Swiss-Prot record:
GO molecular function, one term: serine-type endopeptidase activity
Compartment(s): Mitochondrion intermembrane space; Mitochondrion membrane
InterPro entries membership: PDZ, PDZ_6, PDZ_sf, Peptidase_S1_PA, Peptidase_S1C
Quaternary structure note: Interacts with th/DIAP1 (via BIR 2 domain).
Residue ranges annotated for the PDZ domain, each copy included: 337-424
Transmembrane segments: 74-92
Function: Serine protease that shows proteolytic activity against a non-specific substrate beta-casein. Promotes or induces cell death either by direct binding to and inhibition of BIRC proteins (also called inhibitor of apoptosis proteins, IAPs), leading to an increase in caspase activity, or by a BIRC inhibition-independent, caspase-independent and serine protease activity-dependent mechanism. Can antagonize antiapoptotic activity of th/Diap1 by directly inducing the degradation of th/Diap1.
EC annotation from Swiss-Prot or TrEMBL: 3.4.21.108
PANTHER family referenced in this protein's UniProt entry, alphabetically: SERINE PROTEASE FAMILY S1C HTRA-RELATED (PTHR22939), SERINE PROTEASE HTRA2, MITOCHONDRIAL (PTHR22939:SF129)
Protein name listed in UniProt: Serine protease HTRA2, mitochondrial
Location of region: Serine protease: 151-314
Origin organism lineage: Eukaryota, Metazoa, Ecdysozoa, Arthropoda, Hexapoda
Membrane topology designation: Single-pass membrane protein
Length: 434
């Protein structure tokens, strides 16, 4: 009965995932059997024939003993194995308790956490930045059947109920178009223009959606030259793009930039701003918008409208909304040419000539074309980004206001003299009526 129970115990150990223990005990027993047989054969070799029966009896007895379960081998292997398993489980439980906070932590440590202040700024305000598309309702994509994108820009949410701030030149003076806004989460909504101030180049849009993340507005009056700033937007239609730099100047007068009828001291920054950044926020390290990205002259020289001036525009726009005045009745719409331009002041000309060898040395005035909308009259007429307009219909062009005057004079065609690098060229543009 005892031998049967031992055999049952061996079978239980073998079936219950202890093969190593089981086979170790069997191998030990087999090794003892082999040693005993070898000793018996050596001892009994001298009396070969006379002791055959005794040797057979001894071998039978040894085999019977070896077939019994070796308790000493079992204890030798089972006890350390059990203690190790218990200790391992305790260590695993302890490690789980200790490692849980570390695994769940998402923030980096060390120098990444200490010096990545730009990432902290972006994480707190990027969700409020939007991508603005101007769709041409007269031309449609061959494959999708959707209106093609005529232009694009940026903006940011300033009220949870869908009010968005951007540049005026992003959304107006583009006939036969519709405005679409894409949020940071990918949702797209049609937008309507609520208010426009062409003098300050500011506009507000409205989309029909609530509970949007809002950009906090800071104070541009407290800025100092050298402060870190972050520009967010969609340059070249690449949404959710982040660039960083410093404030180069907090008091860049509009007269220095050749912008007449604008009493604005622009913020100058070396943060990379290019096509599509217009209307996006310039943010301080507290995650507050301190400016609206407006224009770029060259690499390292860009300008933003101070947020203090923007707040005045927003207050006046709110008053106009209460009175029910609409954007179309308050602001005349000019003929459409499809360019974004910048007056070349003497200081800007000097800077451009020092940076590029393609600037003609005898150039004294003009307007820099730094963006041409695809499909626009300017694009069809042959204007390219980087061209400098010096004359329109035989009249000198000294600033951007001269170009606006030429658009409003009623001439059907605009015959331009431009500088493309060091070459002088003639182009003819037929503006579209509003």
């Amino acid at each position: 009965m005892a031998f049967r129970r031992i055999n049952n115990l061996e079978l239980f150990i073998k079936r219950c995932s202890a093969p190593t223990l089981y086979y170790s005990s069997i191998r030990t027993a087999t090794g003892n059997n082999y040693s005993n047989n070898t000793a018996n054969i050596t001892t009994d070799s001298s009396s070969s024939s006379n002791n055959n029966s005794n040797r057979n009896n001894k071998n039978d007895n040894n085999n019977e003993d070896n077939n019994k379960f070796n308790w000493r081998s079992l204890v030798r292997f089972f006890v350390p194995f059990s203690l190790g398993a218990v200790a391992s489980s305790l260590v695993m439980k302890r490690d789980d308790l200790e490692l849980t906070p570390t695994i769940s932590a998402a923030r980096p440590s060390g120098r990444r956490r200490e010096f990545n202040f730009i990432a902290d700024v972006v994480g707190g305000c990027a969700d409020s930045v939007v991508y603005i598309e101007i769709k041409d309702t007269r031309h449609f994509d061959y494959f999708s059947g959707q209106p093609i994108t005529a232009s694009n820009g940026s903006g940011f949410v300033i009220e949870q109920n869908g009010l968005i701030l951007t540049n005026a030149h992003v959304v107006i003076n583009k006939p036969h178009t519709m405005v679409q806004v894409r949020l940071s989460d990918g949702r797209t909504f049609p937008a309507t223009i609520e208010d426009v101030d062409q003098t300050s180049d500011l506009a507000t849009l409205r989309i029909q959606v609530n509970n949007l993340p809002v950009m906090r507005l800071g104070k541009s009056s407290t800025l100092r030259s050298g402060e870190w700033v972050v520009a967010l937007g969609s340059p070249l239609a690449l949404s959710n793009t982040v660039t960083a730099g410093v404030i180069s100047s907090t008091q860049r007068a509009s007269q220095e930039l050749g912008l007449r009828n604008r009493d604005i001291n622009y913020l100058q920054t070396d943060a990379a701003i290019t096509f599509g950044n217009s209307g996006g926020p310039l943010v301080n390290l507290d995650g507050e918008a301190i400016g609206v990205n407006s224009m770029k002259v060259t690499a390292g020289i860009s300008f933003a409208i101070p947020i203090d001036y923007v707040k005045v525009f927003l207050e006046r726009a709110a008053e106009r909304r209460k009175k029910g005045s609409a954007y179309k009745t308050g602001y005349p719409v000019k003929r459409y040419m499809g360019i974004t331009m910048l007056t070349l002041t003497p200081d800007i000309l000097f800077e451009l000539k020092s940076r590029s060898q393609n600037m003609p040395s005898n150039l004294m005035h003009g307007v820099l074309v730094w963006k041409v909308i695809v499909g626009s009259p300017a694009h069809s007429g042959g204007l390219q980004p980087g061209d400098i307009v010096t004359h329109i219909n035989k009249k000198e062009i000294k600033n951007s206001s001269d170009v606006y005057d030429a658009l409003g004079c009623g001439d059907k065609e605009l015959n331009m003299i431009i500088m493309r690098g060091v070459k002088q060229m003639h182009v003819t543009i037929t503006p579209e009526d509003p």
